[in-house]
Amino acid sequence: MLQTAEAPWSQAETQSAHALFRKAYQRELDGLLATVQAQASQITQIDDLWKLHDFLSAKRHEIDGKYDDRQSVIIFVFAQLLKEGLVQAEELTFLAADKQSKIKALARL
């Protein structure tokens, strides 16, 4: 069961959190795909290709590190996803009010 320092996560919260993580991940990948398609259509030189490669390498590292659902960081991950617009505050209603408040506060930092 997922936990924060304040309160344990219920099974329903845990399942909903995983579902929202998957949804946010897919949103990010969809956006990345659109960006890459647009950039790829503009490639005219080999330097453009290497820039796209560097961009993709950096994005892969960023994305691989972002979607971490370990108990110790899950609140922070949701705050980051909220800050980046990959999840909306309304999508966090499956969480207890104290957890929602903490995520929203962290997203404002």
UniProtKB/Swiss-Prot annotation:
Keywords: Membrane, Thylakoid
Induction info: Transcribed from its own promoter, it may also be cotranscribed with upstream ocp.
Keyword Thylakoid applies: yes
InterPro entries xref list: Fluoresc_Recovery_Reg, FRP
Any GO CC annotation of this UniProt entry: plasma membrane-derived thylakoid membrane
Protein role: Destabilizes orange carotenoid protein-R form (OCP-R), the FRP-OCP interaction accelerates the OCP-R to OCP-O conversion. Increases fluorescence recovery following non-photochemical quenching (NPQ) by OCP, most probably by destabilizing OCP-R binding to the phycobilisome core.
Annotated protein name in UniProt: Fluorescence recovery protein
Subunit structure: Probably a dimer, interacts with the C-terminal domain of OCP-R.
Record membrane topology: Peripheral membrane protein
Result of knocking out the encoding gene: Decreased fluorescence recovery after non-photochemical quenching (NPQ).
Record carries keyword Thylakoid: yes
Predominant cellular place of this UniProt entry's protein: membrane
Highest taxon, organism lineage: Bacteria
Subcellular location: Cellular thylakoid membrane
Short name of any one Pfam family annotated for the protein: FRP
